[in-house]
Design a protein with these regions (language model features):
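Extracytoplasmic gate region of multi-pass secondary transporters
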Residues: 2-3, 202-235, 260-310
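Central cavity-lining transmembrane alpha-helices of secondary-active solute carriers
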Residues: 22-40, 310-322, 401
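Conserved MFS/SLC helix-loop-helix module at the cytosolic interface between two early adjacent transmembrane helices
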Residues: 33-75
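Helix-to-loop junctions at the C-terminal end of transmembrane segments
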Residues: 33-47, 319-332, 413
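C-terminal ends and interior cores of transmembrane alpha-helices
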Residues: 56-71, 341-354, 437
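Intracellular juxtamembrane helix-capping segments at the cytosolic ends
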Residues: 90-104, 288, 370-385
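Glycine-rich segments within core transmembrane alpha-helices of 12-TM secondary carriers
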Residues: 107-135, 393-405
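C-terminal membrane-cytosol helix-exit motif in multi-pass small-molecule transporters
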Residues: 130-135, 157-190, 199-225, 237-253, ...
Length: 457
């Protein structure tokens, strides 16, 4: 439902496409801020406690939309979005690694894809609820979405509170990742120095991404006073953080121990791939309605476009279900690479504005991006043993990509058109494809699903 709110806020609050992207920023900011605390609490509370904590926070966020509708200010809605995302962070950081250790290690990617497929049910019905409550009209044709926006979120809060009772009573085994291989076995074959060098380079790239993310947070504060401050604050803050982080990395590079999860290139590469995947996904989801109301040969209305988003998410769900079988038959990292390459071509077709063919490509992009998040997650924590919980927190933090790229897409769409803005997800999918194709070169091993015990970050 969050992604279909953008068009609603554009019209009700008179926002540009780039300004409405603060919805995605608030959503993924919640993930970014809570990822590490969620991972830390998960180690203290266990799987059950972490899941219950996440569900309670989601319920609080959903109920906040009731007073937010009365306040009727953009910041109030953004706060509710951020609270829900913070709760979801607990679920991502706890439930995903829990899924990977519930069965045979070789099928971890398959299990996590099947579990994630359940999300598709919510994705399908979410846009339908959005069409009913965000874009509803009265008998005279006047929009009533401003008064009814809180209803679906309150409904979600009630359901989530019922789930809290279920998890509080249901038996849940507290499993741990097996440690089947010595730490040295998870490295890249060949010169250990080259492995260390690759790990250091990928860690530096992660610091670049982190610097941009912190720059965006500074921008969120600065643009409260003036939208014109966006680019100066972003560039200045990013450069400052990158300089500081680079100096720290340079001084501490010799202290990167073999036991650190950051010494594993396949993990540090996964955080980058996850950043770019979520960036691409968030941008496509956020501007789907804008695309459907302006770009096809026969544009549709807001409510119809919101309903069509359900078709896109149905494609997403189908991709998850089919993809779970595909990654079971073929190497998960190669499937990820191929799917990423296909989405590069699909985004290129959208940019070329080929009429209905481009519109179909948007729906196909939903299908082929479907397996990326859980597959990157499973590949990233492969071989990390008990370090998987900490690694999961960083992989969830990488979701911050979804807060940054929609702003860039929005600026391109405002200055040109929505079709051209698909160059942003195109570049992101290139990065995902590269990670998939080169995963084994980064030290990933299908036979190694749990290696590092009590890793030090």
């Amino acid at each position: 439902m969050i992604d279909v709110m953008d068009k609603h806020f554009q019209e009700e609050l008179h926002l540009s496409l780039a300004q409405s992207a603060w919805v995605q920023f608030a959503h993924y900011l919640g993930y970014f801020l809570m990822a590490l605390p969620a991972g830390w609490l998960a180690t203290k509370l266990g799987y059950r406690g972490g899941i219950i904590a996440g569900l309670l926070m989601v319920a609080v966020g959903g109920l906040w939309f009731i007073p937010a509708t009365q306040i009727a200010q953009f910041w109030a809605f953004l706060l509710g979005v951020c609270l829900i995302a913070a709760g979801l962070t607990f679920l991502e950081a706890v439930a995903n690694p829990y899924t990977t250790v519930l069965g045979a290690p070789d099928f971890a990617a398959t299990r996590i894809n099947l579990a994630a497929a359940c999300n598709g049910i919510g994705w399908i019905f979410g846009p339908i609820a959005g069409a009913m409550f965000f874009y509803s009209t009265d008998a005279s044709g006047k929009s009533t979405g401003a008064e009814t926006l809180w209803m679906p979120y309150a409904g979600v809060a009630v359901v989530v509170l019922l789930m809290v009772l279920v998890f509080a009573k249901a038996p849940m085994p507290d499993l741990k990742a097996e440690e089947t291989l010595p730490a040295e076995a998870a490295g890249i074959p060949g010169n250990p120095a080259s492995t260390h060098s690759m790990a250091g380079f990928l860690l530096w790239l992660n610091l670049v991404v982190l610097s941009v993310s912190l720059g965006m947070i500074a921008c969120a504060i600065a643009t409260i006073f003036s939208e014109a401050l966006f680019l100066p604050v972003l560039s200045g803050t990013t450069a400052l953080f990158l300089l500081v982080f680079s100096l720290v990395l340079l001084l501490q590079r010799k202290k990167m121990r073999l036991e650190s999860i950051w010494s594993r290139p396949h993990f540090s590469g996964a955080t980058l791939a996850q950043f770019f995947y979520v960036a691409a996904q968030s941008g496509i989801f956020a501007y789907f309605i804008n695309y459907m109301t302006t770009q096809p040969p026969v544009p549709v209305g807001n409510a119809t476009a919101s309903t069509l988003a359900s078709v896109g998410f149905a494609c997403f769900l189908a991709g998850r279900v089919i993809g779970a079988g595909v990654v079971k038959k073929f190497s998960a990292h190669m499937v990820l690479g191929v799917y990423g390459a296909v989405n590069v071509l699909l985004c290129a077709c959208v940019m070329l504005r080929l009429g209905w063919a481009s519109t179909v490509c948007v729906f196909l992009a939903y299908f082929f991006m479907s397996i990326m998040f859980p597959t990157i997650f499973a590949l990233g924590i492969s071989g990390l043993g008990d370090g998987a919980k900490k690694a999961a927190s960083f992989l969830v933090m990488a979701i911050m990509g979804g807060a940054i790229m929609p702003k860039l897409m929005g600026h391109i769409a405002d200055s040109s058109n929505v079709s051209l803005s698909f160059i942003v997800p195109l570049c992101c999918f290139l990065c995902v494809a590269a990670y998939g194709f080169f995963w084994s070169k980064l030290g990933g091993s299908p036979k190694s699903m749990a290696v590092i015990s009590e890793s030090k970050i």
